[in-house]
Every structure is written in C-alpha cells, then in structure tokens.
C-alpha cells in the first residue's frame, strides 16, 4: 500500500477534439471505400503542449486522420488510434466497449513487456474511436477512449509539482530547449512523446528512452524523464504520463526508487517561446509484481453531461446548403455500390456532359432522370416558348412561365435545373436547328442565320459527350445526327407515337484514322453461333441510326398537317417511360468497357449473362404501351442512309455548310440522289415491272 502521509498523483484526461473535416472525410470513406465493412481502421491524431492556459487537454483528429503517412502539424505529437465504424446505430449502442478497451489495453501491455514501447514510445498513447455516421441526417455518434493501464496502487508524490523556473536556472532552461530541439531534428520528428534528461549546474542532456541503461549508467536512485504534456494545469500532469509510469514501474522499479518527471510544456506567445510554465515533480516508483496478465484499464470519455456515454454531433445546420445538397444527391447513387452493384463506375456517369436537343416533354423528363444519376453538366437547345399546355406534361415548367407570351424553353429549363440542384452546370440555348426541306435561302439574312445556327450546333456537339435527340419532328434530327456521326459522339434518340416509342443509340463510327477493315476499338467480335439470330453480336460501329431504316430522305413533315398531326399526341405516361429508358440506356453504354462500340443486346439475350453490371446494352428499345411490352431489335447501318452513310459524311466533312445549305434548300431528291436511294427506287420499280411481265407471259 502507498504511504498514507503522501498526496496522490492525479491526471487530466484527454478531451476528444474531432474537426468537421474529420467527419467529412469519414463520410467519403464510408460511402466510397468502407461501405459495409466494419473492420477496424487505423487512424492518426495529435496533441499539442503549447495551448494557452484554461484550454482542456485535447487529442485532435482532422481530415488527415485517415492518411497514416500525412505529416503531423509542427511541434505536435502524433497519436495512433483505431476506428471502429458501425453500420447501424443499434450496432453502435450494443458494441462491447469493455472488450474493445481490453483489447487495446492488452496491445499497450504487450508493447511494455516486449520492450517495443522503449523503441517506439508512441505505442503508449493509443486511442479508440467508436462511431456511427447517419449520412442522411448528418448526425455523427461517437465515443472516444484513450486506454490507460492502472497500477496496483495510487502513485504517491514525494515532491509536489512546481514551475520549471523554480527548479532550473534560466541558463539550464535554455540548454533544455536547445537539447530537446536538437534531439527532435536528429530523429526527424516534430515532437518526442517521452525523453530522458539529466542536468547539473552547467549542462542539460536529453536522450531517447531506449538508451536509458547508458544514459543513467551508475545512477541507482532516481530516474529523470520528460513527458510531452498537453495539460495546462499547474498541479496535475496530462494523460500521456499514466502509461509511461506503468512502463517505468514494470521495467525499472527494481533499479530506481523514484522518478522525477518534467511535464514539458512549450508555448509561444507574442513571438516569444516560453517553457517556464512546465511543471516538475517527483513520485515514488511503485513496485509492480511480475504478472503476464494485463492490468485493469480505464479511458472511455465522458459525454457532455458528465456521464459515461457517447456523444453526438449534428452537422446539418452548419454545412453549406449547396454542399449538403450535393452530398445528398450522391448518397443514393453511392449506396448502390455498397451491395447491389459494387462494380458500378459512377465517375463515368457523373462526369459525362449531356446535350439535350429539345426541351419539351421528352427533354424535361430526360433532364430530371440525368440529375437523378448525378450528371452535373446538362445543356438544352430549343427555339420554342412555354405555352399554357406545357406545364402539366413538362415537369420543368410552371404556370408563371407561360405568362407574357412564355419564357424560352431552353433558358427556363436550365434555370429550373439550377433551382432544383444548385450544383448542376445547366445552360440553355434559344436557337433553331436547320432542317432538310425547310429552305433558308429566302434572303442573305436567313442564310447567314442558318450558318450561325449550324456553327453553334457544331460547337455544342463538339463540347459534349452524349447527344440526346428529343425533338418533335423527324427532319429536325437529321443535322445533329450528321454532325455527331462525323465527330464520333454517342447519340441517344427517343421518339414517341400515340402509344408506342423508340429509344435507340446510334451506331458509333470508327475513329477516322482506322481503316475500313479495322475492328473497333480493339476487341474482335465473337462469331455468331450456328442457328442464332442474323443480328447477333453486331458491334457498335455497325449499328444503324434513326434514319437507316428509311428509303426516303427526310423532308418537311409539318406541311399540310392538321392540328392533331402537328402536335405530339401521345399517352401522357409515354414520355416519362421513354425519357427514363433513354437515360438508362446511356448509363448502360457508359458502364460497358467498349462504350458506344459495345455489341448490341437483343431480345434473344434476355436469358443470357448480361454484358455489364447493369444488364443488357441494346441497340433499340421499342415499346408498345397498349400491350405493356418492349422488344429489343437490332438493325445494321444502311450504306445508303441519308444521315450516317459515308457518302453523306464525306460531303459534309469536305464542303461543310455549302453541302448543308443544298440539303436545306433542295427537295428530298437531293439526298436520295447522293446516297443512291433514287437508283434503288428505280431498280425496285424495274424489278416489279419485270415480275409483272413474267406473269403476263404465263
């Protein structure tokens, strides 16, 4: 038992100081890396011995806590810890805190017994952090523990704490500062958690713990040590001293009767360094009977009410609302990767730049679904204004947008996207798209305007990754199809009937530097099995576009049409279905390693192993709402296509707007003559006449 006449040493426990950056980094780690993994993780904190008077003893964790190689802040001492992050609040509450403390304490005890703590004294200052992160509410529950081994009896004070300036002269204090700094530089560290020191009238010497036998050679009464002390109390040392005294009692109680402890505190105020507020005292070193069993340990932090329990931090109120929205938008997407689709590459989807040609019913629904997938860059092109019939079918508009003649759709749609989610980069262009069969040569003004529209469209397609064709008329899709095919851009097309729709990806032409016989991009196409469909295993560069099934060139489809024929009359739910499928098709294409060159999946592939983590990658999806049915046809590129055939693309790339102006200002026969459709019609008619002649002779 200790001497009842001596006062007992008491210690100031650590207070956890978890920075907002730590919680942000934990959120990112949980979403992107840990997911459902509850295995312990190594983290790193630090404590500082230069705080002003009145501040508590703090162990700080910042955003860099998860990077074990991150540098420790200047003049701070690192502390290694273990993070136990649970998946549910119930698991957090029912975690065996006693077992966690015992396991960590046993690691410290083993380091003491083996001598590893002498080689690496940081092993004495381990900590635990038990957490649960509610990422929907941004509530973070945690319980901090800094394990401290308990000696069999209290530690009696032989000489009570006094200021360093009462024990050492100014010359000795200056020598101590220089000796400590030199040792830190020699070891390449910002601070030493523990060090040996001895002093006489003229000199002060310091050394590492592992050199104690040489440093105190011949001395058998008193051990003098320095402890990097984060405490500011004048009569009590900080928590790091506790485990060191257990180490000293275990290893040196047979050689030394007492320990003189310097609680080294190093403060800079008004540019002047001061260590005189450090305290120095002497304690009796208790004898510690040899035992292989780990001593009892304490260390769980009390909560804000002073009781034994966890703490909770609510960061939802102090976070930037825009950043909070951005994190929340990504939450559901990242949760897909935890269990359902662990191979999903979200970066490919989020970073894609999408150009929506058409801001009507299809355009609005496509835009909302793109935002649901986390796409951050959306551009609208449309020349119409919002009418009173639009808001009920087009969810980006409201009644006020129709007043005063109506706002331009493209600009209003972009503005509404930014109101829905400020993190989206949305823009709108109020412009017309020149079309075949719609002349632009009425005057120099109209011709020049058409030229500017074409140049603007070329720039937009060139600066985006995926082009959505969502317009009302067939001919309005021709020019973007040609430009996108020439620039090798992925095109997703959606078109509506009354109760039918088609969603398709255009075939992606080979890179221009490849020869006609090269496969694209690098993988051979698997041969079709005998007896399989004629359209099996068709690679992306052989797939047709929206116009490849036509045997006539596009023209003015609005001429001589009644009102019900001019407007897109379709069942109200059709655009929502088609718009969603268009975006999902894009995402599936992006997830395929070949991208737009992916082999097309057909209806025959529905029972086969899907090519991507999200399933099939079809060429077309044709839906029939009257039967609630979809089919996945595949069609080959047509060598006489009026939009994507080599003849059309060559003319466009060679002549540019000159060629396009001929298409706009001429009848459909111009494109048909160019591509060979006219000759095909003539040959077909000749064959029919020949068949009739044969029948007449019979």
Curated annotation (Swiss-Prot):
Motif FAP motif is found at: 11-13
Organism's domain of life?
Eukaryota
- InterPro entries from the xrefs? Atg7, Atg7_N, Atg7_N_1, Atg7_N_2, ThiF/MoeB/HesA, ThiF_NAD_FAD-bd, Ubiquitin-activating_enz
Membrane-crossing segments per the record: none
Q: What is expression of this protein induced or repressed by?
A: Induced in liver hepatocytes by 24 hours of starvation.
Post-translational changes noted in the entry: Acetylated by EP300.
Any coiled-coil ranges, and where?
none
SUPFAM superfamilies from the UniProt entry: Activating enzymes of the ubiquitin-like proteins
Q: What are the protein's GO molecular function terms?
A: Atg12 activating enzyme activity; Atg8 activating enzyme activity; protein homodimerization activity
The UniProt function text for this chain reads:
E1-like activating enzyme involved in the 2 ubiquitin-like systems required for cytoplasm to vacuole transport (Cvt) and autophagy. Activates ATG12 for its conjugation with ATG5 as well as the ATG8 family proteins for their conjugation with phosphatidylethanolamine. Both systems are needed for the ATG8 association to Cvt vesicles and autophagosomes membranes. Required for autophagic death induced by caspase-8 inhibition. Facilitates LC3-I lipidation with phosphatidylethanolamine to form LC3-II which is found on autophagosomal membranes.
Q: Which family does it belong to?
A: Belongs to the ATG7 family.
Q: What is this protein called?
A: Ubiquitin-like modifier-activating enzyme ATG7
Native organism is Rattus norvegicus
């Amino acid at each position: 038992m200790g001497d009842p006449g001596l006062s007992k040493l008491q210690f100031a426990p650590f207070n956890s100081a978890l920075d907002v950056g730590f919680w942000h980094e934990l959120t990112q780690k949980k979403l992107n890396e840990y997911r459902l993994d509850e295995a312990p993780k190594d983290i790193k904190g630090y404590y500082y011995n230069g705080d002003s008077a009145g501040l508590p003893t703090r162990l700080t964790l910042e955003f860099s806590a998860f990077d074990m190689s991150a540098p420790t802040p200047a003049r701070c001492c690192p502390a290694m810890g273990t993070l136990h992050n649970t998946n549910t609040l119930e698991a957090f509450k029912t975690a065996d805190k006693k077992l966690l403390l015992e396991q960590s304490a046993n690691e410290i005890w083993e380091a003491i017994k083996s001598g590893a703590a002498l080689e690496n004294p940081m092993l004495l200052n381990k900590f635990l952090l038990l957490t649960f992160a509610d990422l929907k509410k941004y509530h973070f529950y945690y319980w901090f523990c800094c394990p401290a081994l308990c000696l069999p009896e209290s530690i009696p004070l032989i000489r009570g704490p006094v200021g360093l300036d009462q024990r050492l002269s100014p010359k000795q204090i200056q020598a101590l500062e220089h000796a400590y700094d030199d040792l830190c530089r020699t070891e390449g560290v910002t601070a030493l958690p523990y060090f040996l020191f001895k002093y006489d009238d003229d000199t002060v010497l310091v050394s590492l713990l592992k050199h104690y036998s040489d440093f105190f050679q011949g001395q058998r009464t008193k051990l003098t040590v320095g402890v990097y002390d984060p405490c500011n109390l004048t009569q009590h040392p900080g928590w790091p001293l506790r485990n060191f005294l257990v180490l000293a009692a275990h290893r040196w109680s047979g050689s030394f009767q007492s320990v003189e402890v310097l609680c080294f505190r190093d403060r800079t105020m008004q540019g002047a360094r001061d260590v005189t507020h450090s305290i120095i005292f002497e304690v009796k070193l208790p004898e510690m009977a040899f035992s292989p069993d780990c001593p009892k340990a304490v260390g769980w932090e009390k909560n804000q009410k002073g009781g034994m329990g966890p703490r909770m931090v609510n960061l939802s109120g102090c976070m930037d609302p825009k950043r909070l929205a951005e994190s929340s938008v990504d939450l559901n997407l990242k949760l897909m990767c935890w269990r359902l689709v662990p191979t999903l590459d979200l970066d490919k989807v989020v970073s894609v730049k999408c150009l929506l040609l058409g801001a009507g019913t299809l355009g609005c629904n496509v835009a909302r679904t793109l935002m649901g997938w986390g796409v951050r860059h959306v551009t609208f092109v449309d020349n119409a204004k919002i009418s009173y019939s639009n808001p009920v079918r087009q969810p980006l508009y409201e009644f006020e947008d129709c007043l005063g003649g109506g706002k331009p759709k493209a600009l209003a749609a972009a503005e509404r996207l930014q109101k829905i989610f400020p993190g989206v980069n949305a823009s709108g262009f109020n412009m017309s798209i020149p079309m075949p069969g719609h002349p632009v040569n009425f005057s120099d003004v109209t011709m020049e305007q058409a030229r500017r529209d074409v140049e603007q469209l070329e720039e937009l397609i060139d600066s985006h990754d995926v082009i959505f064709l969502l317009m009302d008329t067939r001919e309005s899709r021709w020019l973007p199809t040609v430009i996108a095919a020439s620039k090798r851009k992925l095109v997703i097309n959606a078109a509506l009937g009354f109760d039918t729709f088609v969603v398709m990806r255009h075939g992606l032409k080979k890179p221009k530097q490849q020869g006609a016989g090269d496969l694209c991009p690098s993988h051979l196409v698997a041969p079709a099995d005998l007896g399989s469909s004629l359209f099996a295993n068709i690679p992306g560069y052989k797939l047709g576009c929206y116009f490849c099934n036509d045997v006539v060139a596009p023209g003015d489809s609005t001429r001589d049409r009644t009102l019900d024929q001019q407007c897109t009359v379709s069942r109200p739910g059709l655009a929502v279905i088609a718009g969603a499928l268009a975006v999902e098709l894009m995402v599936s294409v992006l997830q395929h390693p070949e991208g737009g060159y992916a082999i097309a999946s057909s209806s025959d592939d529905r029972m086969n192993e899907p090519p991507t983590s999200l399933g099939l990658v079809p060429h077309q999806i044709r839906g029939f709402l009257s039967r609630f049915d979809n089919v996945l046809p595949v069609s080959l590129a047509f060598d006489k296509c009026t939009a994507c055939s080599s003849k059309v693309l060559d003319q466009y790339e060679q002549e540019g707007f000159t060629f396009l102006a001929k298409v706009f200002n001429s009848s459909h026969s111009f494109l048909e003559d160019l591509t060979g459709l006219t000759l095909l019609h003539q040959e077909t008619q000749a064959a029919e006449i020949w068949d009739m002649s044969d029948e007449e002779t019979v």
